[in-house]
Design a protein with these regions (language model features):
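Active-site-proximal helices and loops of the catalytic beta/alpha 8
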Residues: 236, 240-244, 254, 262-273, ...
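Glycine-rich, histidine-containing beta strand-loop boundary motifs that form or position
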Residues: 63, 103, 159, 203-204, ...
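Short, solvent-exposed loop/turn segments at secondary-structure junctions
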Residues: 153-156, 206-207, 252-253, 366, ...
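Substrate-binding/active-site clefts of carbohydrate-active enzymes
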Residues: 145, 151-198, 205-357, 362, ...
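Carbohydrate-interacting/catalytic domains
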Residues: 1-147, 151, 157, 170-198, ...
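Short glycine/proline- and charge-enriched loop/turn segments
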Residues: 169, 214-222, 334-336, 420-425, ...
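Hydrophobic faces of well-ordered beta-strands that scaffold small-molecule active sites
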Residues: 146-148, 200-202, 246-248, 368, ...
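Active-site clefts of carbohydrate-active enzymes
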Residues: 453-477
Length: 618
């Protein structure tokens, strides 16, 4: 809801014209080009956020249009030891409107922020103009959606087992298959629906010689081992009948050497029509191998013959400086079987854009998760969004960008990111316990402020994936730690990301350990984490505030985290207790109803059970 303009001394900037002075000790942050700081609502009103040092006690958005001036008070939405985060939703404003910020220092003096910086006075022309209101069109259905990620070769198998496959449930291998397929996924859709899944995210399904399939041979063919194209069509149709959406995983940065264009380059060299689709440093193609530079995990005696066979190029042993293996063409992280595609080449770019549109248009998928987005030419993603959205305006576009993904989430590229920062936060507080609750709340608040509100609601908040160790393994096998992380995941703003098998308490180290086969026979829906997820997804459906509500951290003790989710007049308190003892929290308000969890509320005092969580309606 937009704020009302208020008469206030800070809003009367007639009195502060003069010679500006630099108040450099005040750290105030606002970037009008970052949607995390300035975004627009559907009615054209502006959502404005500013970060300040905690000592500033009051903040106001000062909007001037012609002779009129309005002051809109910003409210504190989160605090850390380093920053206070202020926010206001105000407007819509006239096209002529210009704005600055005013703050009150502890000594009651005014502090001002304008395009020229932090100052003690405002110059008449030193103001920002509001850009034309434009919505960051994140699909509504993706906001708060429960996303279930699965590794197709290891999730479920349908029919008789091929004798060339490893036995189902055998120790996971980087090179061998266990026979999971898309028909097997269809057979488990009712299970996923019962769990509360809204979106099914599949690791790559296109034809490839590897079980991870990030080295694609044919982008127009679903791997026959998975059942082929019609198996995907059937999966999409059956999932949609259960109101589950499907997003595919695309790796357009690199291909397998058997990809038609690279194969032509390998055979014809500079005469190939596809020569500029790749970045070849030397011709003829070859591999330089430096045995004395190899790490212990890289067994060159095993891998070099494999690479020579797959790529069809010779290798030579050298003893100079350089990486252990160096192809004479650019490849993803130097892996010879993943030559990089030159997406600045118009034809290569056009090919990949056609692929992106094809699966949305012809097979009805609901979006894409794009691999290693950081390493692709940034403007490719502008074209990618335009092409996919032309086919399906509400397609969900998810990027894999480790760390701060802000540059990819300004409304012109992706809708959301795989939120590995969220995972790191959960690992440090819940799995290993090496940070205290106040540090956890600081980082959660910083994460909340990092992106625009639509992006925050759509970010995939994962605690595990195919590229990480499983959370239970990170937690030393202590299931209560996974339980607490799941409670936080299901109550913090965003789209909770479940990695297949975590609901069954699967363990496993990093790749390939985290890619084991689902054990459908010895586990079932009575497993504690499975039941927890079912309960919380059901609660999310009943309580829109847990999905769309504003977030604010309220308190942190050594092991107790308390925050609220508020949507209009509905306010929920979430309490998570990491301690082995019961915890108490004195809440404001006269009424407290326990909606879920272990504990109770009496006379404003809320008690949370040991190593458990609680959701309270206030």
């Amino acid at each position: 809801m937009a704020s009302r303009a208020e008469p206030h001394p800070l809003a009367d900037d007639h009195g502060v014209y003069g010679m500006p002075g630099d108040l450099s000790p005040w750290d105030i942050r606002f970037d009008p080009e970052d949607r995390a700081h300035l975004d627009f609502e559907s009615d054209g009103s502006a959502r404005v956020r500013v970060w300040t040092e905690p000592e500033l006690v009051e903040a106001m958005l000062v909007v001037r249009s012609g002779r009129s001036v309005e002051g809109h008070a910003l409210r504190v939405v989160a605090r850390t030891a380093r920053f206070t985060f202020w926010e206001v939703v105000a407007g819509p404003f006239q096209e002529s409107a210009r704005f600055t910020f005013a703050f009150r220092a502890p000594n009651a003096e005014g502090v001002y922020l304008a395009p020229s910086g932090v100052t003690n006075a405002i110059e008449r022309l030193d103001r920002w103009a509001f850009p034309a209101p434009s919505l960051h069109s994140v699909p509504e259905w993706s906001k708060g959606a429960v996303i279930y990620q699965l590794f197709p070769d290891r999730f479920a198998r349908h029919g008789a087992m091929d004798t060339d496959l490893d036995p189902w449930g055998s120790p996971p291998s980087s090179t061998r298959f266990q026979g999971g397929d898309l028909a097997g996924v269809v057979g488990r859709l009712d299970y996923l629906s019962d769990l509360g899944v809204d979106v099914l995210y599949l690791n790559p399904v296109f034809t490839s010689p590897s079980n991870h399939r990030y080295d694609t041979i044919d982008y127009h063919e679903v791997d026959p081992l998975l059942g082929g194209n019609e198996a995907l069509r059937n999966l999409v149709d059956e999932a949609h009948r259960r109101s589950i959406r499907i997003i595919l995983d695309g790796s357009f940065n690199h291909v397998h050497p058997e990809f038609f264009a690279f194969r032509d380059v390998a055979g014809r060299g500079p005469a190939s029509a596809y020569w500029d689709w790749f970045l070849v440093d030397e011709w003829p193609l070859r591999l330089r191998v430096r045995p004395d530079r190899a790490h212990s995990f890289l067994d060159l005696a095993v891998w070099v013959p494999v690479w020579e066979s797959e790529i069809g190029v010779p290798s030579e042993v050298v003893h100079d400086d350089g990486p252990a293996v160096e192809p004479s063409y650019q490849a993803w992280y130097g892996v010879p079987t993943m030559p990089r595609v030159n997406l600045t080449n118009p034809d290569a770019r056009g090919y990949m854009l056609d692929v992106a549109a094809h699966w949305v248009r012809e097979y009805g998928i609901d979006g894409w998760r794009m691999d290693v987005a950081r390493y692709v030419d940034p403007d490719f993603w502008d074209d990618f969004r335009r092409v996919v959205r032309a086919v399906r305006p509400d397609a969900y576009l998810l990027c894999e960008v480790m760390g701060d993904a802000s540059d990819w989430l300004q409304g012109n590229r992706f809708d959301a990111t795989m939120n590995y920062t969220f995972r790191d936060l959960c690992v440090h507080f819940f799995a290993t316990g090496d940070i205290a609750a106040d540090v956890f709340c600081d980082r959660a608040a910083r994460l909340w402020a990092q992106y625009s509100w639509p992006v925050t609601l759509a970010n995939q908040n994962l605690i595990g994936s195919h590229d990480t160790a499983r959370f239970l393994t990170e937690a030393g096998g202590e299931e209560w730690r996974l339980r607490l992380a799941t409670i936080f995941q299901m109550t913090y703003p965003g789209a909770p990301g479940i990695y297949y098998g975590d609901e069954m308490g699967m363990s496993g180290g990093e790749d390939p350990g985290s890619r084991g086969a689902m054990d459908w026979e010895s586990t079932g829906p009575d497993h504690g984490i499975h039941s927890l997820i079912r309960e919380l997804t059901e609660l999310r459906r009943k309580e829109p505030a847990l999905v769309m509500g504003d977030w604010r951290a309220l308190s942190s003790q050594a092991n107790l985290v308390v925050f609220e989710r508020r949507l209009i007049d509905r306010c929920l308190l979430v309490l998570i207790n990491r301690s082995s003892a019961r915890a108490r929290y004195e809440a404001s308000g006269a009424s407290h109803e326990v909606l879920w969890g272990e504990g109770g509320a009496e006379n404003g005092v809320i008690t949370v059970g040991p190593r458990s969580g609680l959701v309270i309606a206030q």
